Amino acid sequence: MKKADSEQVGGVILQYLREMGLETLLNEHRLIQAWDKVLGPSVSRYTKEIRIYNQVLFVTISSAALRNELMMRRTELVSRLNAEAGAQVITQIVLK
């Protein structure tokens, strides 16, 4: 039997995460996980560190040539990573 005011489990969990202040952390984790999926294994191999601070994604890349190529695609990468994470998590990328 279904109650008239029943909710989907996903909605209840999302509401709980918002109330506990954990939604941002979850979205940041999703975005960091999306780095490998969006950029693939060839870029992941040269990725040394990824972190997010104040909506800025900081990525350390060990290859100067790859870092320069990614710098030219930063705007596109911000859009693709946010889309993969399902939220506006970052506003810019800093490559080191």
Set out the residue ranges of the language-model regions.
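Short edge beta-strands and adjacent turn/loop segments
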Residues: 34-58
